[in-house]
Curated annotation (Swiss-Prot):
<feature type="binding site">
    <location>
        <position position="137"/>
    </location>
    <ligand>
        <name>Fe cation</name>
    </ligand>
</feature>
<keyword id="KW-0408">Iron</keyword>
<comment type="similarity">
    <text>Belongs to the polypeptide deformylase family.</text>
</comment>
<feature type="binding site">
    <location>
        <position position="133"/>
    </location>
    <ligand>
        <name>Fe cation</name>
    </ligand>
</feature>
<dbReference type="GO" id="GO:0042586">
    <property type="term" value="F:peptide deformylase activity"/>
</dbReference>
<dbReference type="GO" id="GO:0006412">
    <property type="term" value="P:translation"/>
</dbReference>
<protein>
    <recommendedName>
        <fullName>Peptide deformylase</fullName>
        <ecNumber>3.5.1.88</ecNumber>
    </recommendedName>
</protein>
<keyword id="KW-0648">Protein biosynthesis</keyword>
<dbReference type="GO" id="GO:0046872">
    <property type="term" value="F:metal ion binding"/>
</dbReference>
<comment type="function">
    <text>Removes the formyl group from the N-terminal Met of newly synthesized proteins. Requires at least a dipeptide for an efficient rate of reaction. N-terminal L-methionine is a prerequisite for activity but the enzyme has broad specificity at other positions.</text>
</comment>
<dbReference type="GO" id="GO:0043686">
    <property type="term" value="P:co-translational protein modification"/>
</dbReference>
<dbReference type="InterPro" id="IPR036821">
    <property type="entry name" value="Peptide_deformylase_sf"/>
</dbReference>
<dbReference type="InterPro" id="IPR023635">
    <property type="entry name" value="Peptide_deformylase"/>
</dbReference>
<keyword id="KW-0378">Hydrolase</keyword>
<feature type="binding site">
    <location>
        <position position="91"/>
    </location>
    <ligand>
        <name>Fe cation</name>
    </ligand>
</feature>
<dbReference type="Pfam" id="PF01327">
    <property type="entry name" value="Pep_deformylase"/>
</dbReference>
<keyword id="KW-0479">Metal-binding</keyword>
Length: 169
């Protein structure tokens, strides 16, 4: 298992639409395990394969305080959503940035687990928000896309400045 490189905005690879996983096999399971290692190392609660330059429909999530409730969503489909909510979201691909994003309060998804078994899951609150955030990544959408063009431009400038500072160190 290993920690993968997380892509950072404005990297255009974050905009690539992920393709469905054709078969859940040992290679896919290794990707899932590496994604969990990466997410935990980066102190995130969710990670989409797109964020680590793997353009397949794979999401890993763990919103638990203890970091012991792993959720794998392969080829996730949103089948129901209801209610309105929103929290200040952050993203491993957009460091040091948070913004209020409107989301559905409850979702129901269908997906495959790490073993390739189909399941359905109903989620609310933080888990529902995290699922929606990560599913956006699979279609090349970032949480800042919900913001005004001016706010997005300011974030881009801030991150470009951070990248320059980091490249000097």
């Amino acid at each position: 298992m290993s920690v993968l490189q997380v892509l950072h905005f404005p990297d255009e690879r974050l905009r690539i639409t992920a393709q469905p996983v054709k078969e859940v096999n040992a290679d896919i399971q290794r990707i899932v395990d590496d994604m969990f290692d990466t997410m935990y190392e980066e102190e995130g609660i969710g990670l989409a394969a797109t964020q680590v330059d793997i353009h397949q429909r794979i999401i890993v999530i763990d919103v638990s305080e203890e970091r012991d409730q792993r959720l794998v969503l392969i080829n996730p489909e949103l089948i129901e959503k209801s209610g309105d909510t929103g929290i200040e979201e952050g993203c491993l691909s957009i460091p040091e940035t948070r913004a209020l994003v409107p989301r559905a309060e409850h979702v129901k998804v269908r997906a495959l687990d790490r073993e390739g078994k189909a399941f359905e899951l109903e989620a609310s609150e933080l888990l529902a928000i995290c699922i929606q955030h990560e599913m956006d990544h699979l279609v090349g959408k970032l949480f800042i896309d919900y913001l005004s063009p001016l706010k997005r431009q300011r974030i881009r400038q801030k991150l470009e400045k951070l990248a320059k500072q980091n490249s000097r160190t």
